[in-house]
Amino acid sequence: MSRVAKAPVSIPAGVEVKLDGQLLTVKGKNGELSRTIHNAVEVKQDNNELTFSPREGIVGADAQAGTARALVNAMVIGVTEGFTKKLQLVGVGYRAQIKGNAVALSLGFSHPVEHALPAGITAECPSQTEIVLKGADKQLIGQVAADIRAYRRPEPYKGKGVRYADEVVRIKEAKKK
């Protein structure tokens, strides 16, 4: 059995978990998330714990049990604490601002880029060169951050572009004569 799946997911106070067949719904102060658990995984709810075990005779069930446990744990953390992702804009004239339910980016193109935010994700700009994304769905926050970064990825010679706050951009040496 997967080492990750052996540990049960504890359900904190204020979080409501509903298991309907293979559909798991987690509800908390930050919203509601639901996910369909793979058929190779058996989920049991005992008091304030969820346990995940692989079904017998299915190839890859151990791996699916560990994956399901990690995804559900992220859902529980998301509805209680939430997740944040920080982006930095590095470059002359690179700016960001919030316009309603979208992030307006000035990234050196001839036109400003507007990225609409999906439901459940909020953004704020503490400064013109910083974007902070917040929400309950870890996967969705990562996807939105990756989409914004894809408009202008950091280039390797000067490091200009949109980068994650914890990302280290390796700078190449310029060509010598």
Swiss-Prot record:
Cysteine-cysteine disulfides: none
One annotated GO molecular function: structural constituent of ribosome
InterPro entries tied to this protein: Ribosomal_uL6-like (IPR000702), Ribosomal_uL6-like_a/b-dom_sf (IPR036789), Ribosomal_uL6_a/b-dom (IPR020040), Ribosomal_uL6_bac-type (IPR019906), Ribosomal_uL6_CS (IPR002358)
Signal peptide feature range: none
Recorded superkingdom: Bacteria
Pfam families registered for this protein in UniProt: Ribosomal_L6
UniProt keyword annotations, A-Z: Ribonucleoprotein, Ribosomal protein, RNA-binding, rRNA-binding
GO terms under cellular component: cytosolic large ribosomal subunit
Biological role: This protein binds to the 23S rRNA, and is important in its secondary structure. It is located near the subunit interface in the base of the L7/L12 stalk, and near the tRNA binding site of the peptidyltransferase center.
Entry's family note: Belongs to the universal ribosomal protein uL6 family.
HAMAP family with a match to the protein in the record: Ribosomal_uL6_B
Protein name: Large ribosomal subunit protein uL6
Gene source species: Pasteurella multocida (strain Pm70)
Lineage, top ranks: Bacteria, Pseudomonadati, Pseudomonadota, Gammaproteobacteria, Pasteurellales
